[in-house]
A protein has these predicted regions:
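A structural signal for conserved, well-ordered secondary-structure elements
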Residues: 1-777
């Protein structure tokens, strides 16, 4: 028996996953009286984004009445973005108000949170952090170099100059900085001079020059009387890497804000997740029996591991802000996890029904299922890496690797998109661990147990039962209808967009931010309707909060648009609100007309990122499927993908939902999901070409392969759509329209993905091949 001696692997793997799931969700903490010490972070320690748990709103203005130019404000915006990402604050909105020379920042934080100090973060964000090296020990000494000549800074701990170990900052200079530092140290070594290092007006280190330093590096150490702590060097390295502000900033106002998705959004999503996982477990077990049940155990481990990477469960990985787009990345990764298990279970079932023994079916099923799983996951990894490179911090690994693609846009970040890429990449890599490795260990272990060796537990038919003959659908024969329908659908979506109009969020267009104070409680939807009528805009977003300094309750109204809002219009708004709701006593606190947080450059960069990802995917498909004309197949896959993206766009238009960062995340999710569906179909075509050779025409080959892949494609999509469907229902029950307008377009895009992967991409491929063949003849 080939699986003899492996039964213990099933028990051990299940126990390890169960222990990991428990600790990942609940953490490990010891309570001693009233004091609780956390040793391992759990799901409760996840820092959720502003959209889910609320946060703080800060307005920065130049210190001492400094008159900043538009270019300086834009430069300050970039530095603050880099500092936020360095602090692992990836969910933020940062706007510039050029009229009042202010920067308005929102980032997540919850009252009572101890792992993150918002006031310390605000202080660090607003610090100028101008690094200089000067000759001598005074602040007016001759400048040797500044922070712009530093390529990177890293916090280190170890022996310095042969003495005891201490914390220090290791610097690596640019070529220009290395030359300047080498020249200065060579000269000062000969004269016995010193070099002092300054951060703003603070002398952080002064040292005698004992040798010429020409290797392009240096270290910043502390004095013996005031040694650096680990926190000191980490903060200093972070500030140096993020760059210096062009002017000093002062906090003008500071207030808390409520979740933009609603107070109950997190509870709703947890409930939706539990229900969705239960339904997936029932479906997988019903369809695939024992392998389906074991797949759900592995899937639970994958979900827990993804949350562990976000919560800071692993000490080597810092906690990460989880936003709605980040949750979308997890959903997509879960879909990929289900897909890997469905492919494997389907292959095992096929082998059993072809007459193979259980051991033979497992061996063959695992081997034949691995290639499509890898191919599908690689396409998702490509998307995730491009997103992290395009929208992550400029000193990040992927940003440096892809600098040659995005250098024209300058260094810029988009935290929510970066978070999406992070959770997506993490989830897909974990899919290899749980969806492939863990599942296979458990199935092999189960097959080694005598009571679990009945082939029917793995999908085989009962003895003597003849499998029902599967009816072949002539997908390729209907290609003209499919292609015509897709063309008409996209034309209809364009027409709807023209007739109904496309609503862009403040993130893209800029607009006005009106902050009001109020008393007592009110019905949000009613106030939103009144405000919309008073301002003549249907795209308003309302958030409640509290001013930290005064304790006043605040209402922030965001109004997208390119035209400024005047004080007279704000007065009209106040008159309407106070007339309709006299008990609330609305009063104006501030008015800011802001530029777009994600403006033209962001849209251009998004387009380049998508195109670059598609080019890489096309190249991968062309290489992997070169024996069956992979380049043409890749082009047809990209063409079919446009259908899916248009469906997502059209759904947003029909729902009259504003296009914002969540829209970008939804589009990127469908890009990865749909391409994966198509690649799995292509993999079956390649396999059948090897089996059938020239016995079948290309049309017959494609049609046979699509029929074989249809069940897997439909089941995978049903499980993911089921999760999104539950989210839609729960969000409606909880009155969370923002979640619904995110989940529903995703669901429609995935349904479109089934259609295009089975009916459009392959049909277009056959039609192209026929036309190409006709030209040759």
């Amino acid at each position: 028996m080939k699986t003899k001696g492996k039964a213990w692997q099933l028990v051990l793997t299940v126990l390890l996953i169960a222990a990991f799931v428990y600790t990942a969700f609940f953490g490990v903490a010891v309570k001693n009286g009233y004091v609780s010490t956390t040793y391992v972070n759990g799901a409760k320690d996840i820092r959720f984004g502003v959209d889910i748990k609320g946060g703080v709103n800060v307005t920065f203005v130049p210190s001492d009445g400094y008159d900043a130019t538009d270019d300086q404000l834009e430069a300050a915006q970039l530095v603050i973005e880099n500092r936020l990402v360095a602090l692992n604050v990836t969910d933020y909105e940062l706007y510039v108000d050029n009229n009042s020379d202010s920067l308005i920042l929102e980032f997540p934080w919850q009252s009572g949170e101890t792992e993150f100090d918002p006031e310390a973060a605000i202080e660090e964000i607003g610090t100028t952090a101008y690094l200089t090296f000067r000759e001598g020990s005074s602040a007016d000494g001759e400048l040797v170099l500044d922070g712009s000549m530093v390529e990177s800074a890293a916090a280190q701990y170890g022996p310095v100059n042969g003495s005891s170990s201490e914390y220090y900052v290791a610097l690596k200079f640019t070529d220009e900085g290395a030359k300047a530092f080498g020249d200065a140290t060579t000269r000062l070594y000969q004269t016995g001079g010193t070099i002092s290092i300054w951060l703003d007006d603070e002398n952080v280190s002064t040292a005698s020059v004992n040798a010429a330093i020409t290797d392009g590096s240096a270290i910043i150490t502390s004095s013996a009387s005031n040694p650096f702590t680990q926190e000191d060097v980490v903060k200093m390295a972070r500030q140096i890497n993020s760059g210096s502000l062009p002017f000093a900033l002062t906090v003008d106002s500071y207030s808390t804000i409520s979740p933009s998705l609603g107070e109950n959004s997190l509870s709703a999503m947890v409930l939706a997740g539990v229900i969705a996982f239960a339904l997936i477990m029932v479906l997988m077990t019903a369809l695939y029996r024992l392998p389906g049940f074991l797949a759900c155990i592995a899937l639970a481990g994958q979900v827990a591991a993804t949350l562990a990477f976000v919560s800071g469960y692993f000490p080597v990985f810092e906690s990460f802000t989880l936003t709605l787009p980040g949750i979308a990345g997890i959903i997509l990764a879960i879909g990929m996890g289900v897909d890997a298990n469905v492919i494997t279970a389907e292959r095992i079932k096929e082998e059993l029904r072809s007459g193979k023994s259980l051991d033979g079916a497992l061996k063959s099923g695992f081997a034949r299922g691995l290639t499509p799983i890898i191919d599908g996951n690689v396409t998702i990894v490509i998307v995730a890496i491009v997103l992290m490179g395009a929208f992550g911090p400029s000193d990040g690994f992927f940003a440096k690797a892809l600098h040659f693609v995005f250098f024209a846009f300058g260094p810029s970040t988009a935290g929510t998109i970066y978070a999406f890429g992070y959770t997506l990449l993490t989830g897909v890599l974990l899919n290899f661990v749980f969806g492939i490795f863990a599942t296979r260990i458990m199935i092999r272990g189960a097959a080694a147990i005598k009571a679990l060796r009945d082939p029917r537990l793995y999908g085989a038919d009962a003895p003597g039962k003849t499998p029902a003959e599967k009816k072949q659908v002539n997908f390729v024969g209907l290609r003209k209808r499919f292609l015509t329908f897709s063309a008409c659908l996209m034309a209809a979506i364009v027409l709807c967009a023209v007739v109904l109009g496309v609503h862009l969020d403040t993130e893209f267009t800029g607009g006005a931010m009106i902050t009001l104070s109020y008393e007592n409680s009110f019905e949000m939807s009613a106030v939103q309707k009144t405000a919309s009528e008073a301002l003549g805009s249907n795209g308003l977003t309302l958030q409640t909060g509290e001013n930290v300094a005064t304790g006043e309750q605040t209402l922030k109204i965001s109004m997208p648009g390119t035209e400024t809002v005047t004080t007279n219009e704000v007065q009209t708004l106040l008159d309407s609100l106070n007339e309709s709701y006299p008990d609330n006593s609305f009063a104006q606190l501030s008015l800011s007309n802001v530029s777009a947080a994600m403006g033209t450059k962001f849209l251009q960069k998004s387009l380049v990122a998508v195109v670059f990802a598609l080019v890489l995917i096309l190249a991968y498909i062309a290489y992997r499927f070169k024996n069956i004309g992979g380049l043409t197949g890749g082009m047809m896959a990209v063409l079919a993908l446009l259908n899916d993206l248009m469906v997502v766009f059209g759904t947003f238009v029909l729902l009259r939902a504003p296009l914002d960062g969540n829209f970008i995340a939804a589009m990127l999710t469908i890009l990865g999901y749909s391409i994966n569906d198509t690649v799995v179909v292509y993999d079956r075509i390649r396999e059948n070409r090897g089996l059938l050779g020239k016995k079948a025409s290309f049309e017959e080959l494609v049609n046979h392969s699509v029929n074989q892949s249809a069940r897997r494609t439909i089941i995978t999509t049903v499980t993911t759509v089921m999760a999104l469907g539950v989210m839609c229902v729960v969000s409606k029950l909880y009155g969370l329209d923002s979640i619904f307008t995110f989940a529903f377009p995703l669901m429609m895009g995935m349904l479109s993905g089934v259609y295009t992967s089975l009916c459009v991409s392959t049909s277009a491929w056959v039609a192209w091949s026929e036309r190409k063949g006709a030209k040759k003849n």
